[in-house]
Amino acid sequence: MSEVLNKVSDCVDAVFVLSVASFTQRIEHVKKQFQDHGIAFNFVFDYDPPEIDQQLLDDVFAESSMRLPHKSLVLKHIKAWQVAREQSYKRILIFEDDVFLCRDFTQKLCAGVPHIDKLDEGYLVYLGGSDTKVTDSFFLSDDVLVPQPIATTEGYITDLTAINKRLDWLDTNKVTLPADHLVRSIDSLIDIRQYWFREPLVEQGSVFGYFDTELDSSRSKHGRLYNVLRYRWNRFQRRKLRRWLVRMKLLLGMKID
């Protein structure tokens, strides 16, 4: 008889939220949201920008155009992986602090875990992507999990095998990329398979305008209304409209990307 999954804690060994101690609005947002969903979690406040010493930066990062806030976020992801390794957690869930969970997040996550359980060890499952470009084949899949490189890192599940491989890679390589590009790059180099939930479980508040962005200069130069409207348009045309167009291409016998 299969195990009944009712809570997020039934699905993963630990939940980490990466934040900065001075980001009070985001912290209160996370606390309320996760309380509403009944999710136990731990904040990662290690490596806030003012606390990072130069020696650590020199040890971890190579020369690049990355700003200190980007480096801080990379270090926070690494910290969560290190804790998972130290505690021998088999599977963890990592969020960034601008995450918004879908209304039925727990139900959808619990429904997806049996599919995650069938994956070979060494994986990452991305929970977002509602406004991100995907291939035509993404819309033709009937699977709950679709193989695809991640877009961003606001929410993902990963297992201990993948974590150990990433940390081993970092032992002998320096970082030149922000967190999302770094995870995508490392995983492709060390044979960690990445998947998306076909229907996203989370959104990113700094993308759709709820929070001011701290990292993305392309969004920070625009006003909140512009970012809200751009997000809604991208979500419509990259998901709903694309799904319809792919189905039309299939019916007409056109080439599918």
How would you name each of these model-derived features?
Residues S2-F95, V99-D257:
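An acidic/histidine-cluster motif and surrounding catalytic segment
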